[in-house]
């Protein structure tokens, strides 16, 4: 097994397989021990490599992770973006290759400055800190792509109880630390005191996670609210077709008119497929209907505004009836809602001319939505995958709401991964979440991240259920990731300093 730690294709191919196997730890497969195993394979594989060799080992791991975990983007490129199969594959491979550098650069840094083979305990701690750094970085750089975090594997696992303490990143840190410590236990046997410390660091987080699993950090702020979430199941190639807009508006109107009386009536992202000012008459009619039933209607709708004498378009949510507020999406999907370098790319390839791919970013510090006297934190599609961003809104809310249109990704695992991340946000915040989508999965999620009721994908239906507004803050909403970030910064700073001192002695 020495070839695992040595340079060459056998080790690189194993890293590729390890990265790909992470997919099986996440939804919909949920074989969570594979998250620890895949990280352990990468950690072991870096032990004897030069910085350049470690960089490529990390690159292959990242390529495997994204290649297996985000292949479903092909559906939006080919089926809805107009790219030929060959072009879609080429674009997708380039996408995987670029994202793989999120692992290549940290592994180069690890081998160049941070690796401490002579100090196995410190080495494991620093590796976990670096793992957290790379997850945070890939959720931030160039607006971020915070997908496939290792911590999501624990939504139903023993570490789920850590989510309200430090979010998904605390779980990812724990998984990386566990993997590295397991690899190093045999090297600590000659030093009983260090072995004892390592054993505590290995077992304590898992014990704490199990002990806190199911612990209620928040309490009800009022009586349960009755909810109806409509899943229209509109085909993506018809959604923005002017000839089918009236039929879509009629669909949501008729399903709402025939629904049971509820407190909150929720439609998915861009359920109203025309600009809000153009559809205001329709929205007013639906608002009067909702008010007559003592309901609040919440729907996705594109919004047009004049900003500094410039016309801008936003992906939005608006509330009418017994509620108020409009929210404009802040976290946009690259190439889906805006095109980087659009002067160069637009027109060059049909894929970059997708409908509604010229949205502007909504302003920060927007007020939350209000409905039935409660504050609702809104997340439009992609926004729910950003842990810190989501926590900022959740801390001011009584209830969470996410609306989405995952039709872009067809019958793939992408929407199920998206659902898992929404469940983690509910668990981190200790709040109920309403999830309304065009074609699934529409669901209600409790404060422990559990789905209480849902509609199967690709069905036109109305989901009924109850949610409870919650108050008080989980530790994660109070402190976010700052305590963990400080610990990791100290660990990495110590490793850098220790390495420099060692080289001068």
UniProtKB/Swiss-Prot annotation:
It is a multi-pass membrane protein. The keyword Iron-sulfur does not apply. The keyword Heme does not apply. GO terms for cellular component: plasma membrane. Residues 230-469 form the CN hydrolase domain. CDD domains: ALP_N-acyl_transferase. Its EC number is 2.3.1.269. Belongs to the CN hydrolase family. Apolipoprotein N-acyltransferase subfamily. This is Apolipoprotein N-acyltransferase. It comes from Pseudomonas putida (strain ATCC 47054 / DSM 6125 / CFBP 8728 / NCIMB 11950 / KT2440). The lineage of its organism: Bacteria, Pseudomonadati, Pseudomonadota, Gammaproteobacteria, Pseudomonadales.
């Amino acid at each position: 097994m020495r070839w695992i730690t040595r340079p060459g294709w056998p080790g690189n191919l194993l890293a590729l397989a390890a990265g790909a196997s992470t997919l099986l730890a996440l939804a919909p497969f949920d074989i969570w021990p594979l998250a620890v195993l895949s990280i352990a394979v990468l950690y072991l594989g870096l032990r004897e490599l030069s910085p350049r060799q470690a960089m490529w080992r990390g690159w292959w791991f990242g390529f495997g992770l994204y290649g297996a975990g985000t292949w479903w983007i092909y559906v939006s490129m080919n089926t809805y973006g107009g790219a030929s199969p060959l072009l879609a594959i080429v674009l997708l491979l380039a996408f995987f290759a670029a994202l793989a550098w999120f692992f290549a650069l940290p592994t180069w840094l690890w081998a160049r400055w941070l690796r401490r083979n002579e100090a196995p305990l410190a080495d494991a701690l620093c590796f976990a800190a670096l793992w957290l750094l790379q997850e945070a970085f890939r959720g931030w750089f160039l607006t971020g792509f915070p997908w496939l975090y290792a911590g999501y594997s624990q939504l139903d696992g023993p570490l789920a109880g850590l989510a309200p303490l430090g979010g998904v990143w605390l779980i990812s840190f724990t998984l990386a630390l566990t993997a590295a410590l397991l690899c190093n236990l045999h090297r600590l046997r000659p030093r009983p005191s260090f072995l004892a410390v390592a054993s505590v660091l290995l077992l304590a987080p898992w014990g704490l996670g199990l002990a806190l699993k199911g612990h209620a950090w928040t309490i009800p702020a009022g009586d349960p609210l009755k909810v109806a979430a409509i899943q229209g199941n509109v085909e993506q190639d018809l959604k923005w077709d002017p000839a089918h807009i009236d039929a879509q508006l009629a669909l949501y109107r008729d399903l709402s008119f025939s629904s049971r009386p509820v407190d909150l009536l929720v439609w998915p992202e861009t359920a109203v497929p025309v600009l809000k000012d153009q559809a205001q008459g329709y929205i007013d009619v639906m608002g009067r209907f909702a008010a007559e039933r003592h309901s609040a209607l919440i729907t996705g709708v594109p919004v047009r505004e004049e900003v500094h004498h410039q016309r801008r378009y936003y992906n939005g949510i608006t509330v009418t009836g017994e509620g108020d507020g409009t929210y404009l999406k802040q976290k946009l999907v690259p190439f889906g809602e805006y095109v980087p370098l659009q002067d160069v790319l637009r027109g060059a390839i049909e894929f970059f001319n997708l409908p509604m791919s010229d949205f502007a970013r909504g302003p920060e510090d927007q007020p939350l939505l209000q409905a039935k006297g409660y504050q609702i934190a809104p997340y439009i599609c992609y926004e729910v995958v950003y842990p810190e961003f989501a926590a900022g809104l959740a801390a001011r809310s009584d209830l969470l709401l996410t609306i989405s249109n995952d039709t872009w990704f067809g019958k793939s695992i992408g929407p199920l991964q998206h659902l898992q991340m929404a469940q983690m946000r509910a668990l981190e915040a200790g709040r109920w979440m309403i999830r309304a989508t065009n074609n699934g999965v529409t669901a209600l999620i409790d404060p422990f991240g559990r789905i209480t009721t849902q509609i199967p994908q690709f069905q036109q239906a109305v989901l009924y259920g109850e949610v409870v507004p919650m108050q008080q803050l989980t530790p994660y909403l109070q402190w976010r990731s700052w305590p963990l970030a400080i610990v990791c910064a100290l660990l990495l700073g110590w490793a850098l300093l220790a390495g420099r001192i060692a080289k001068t002695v």
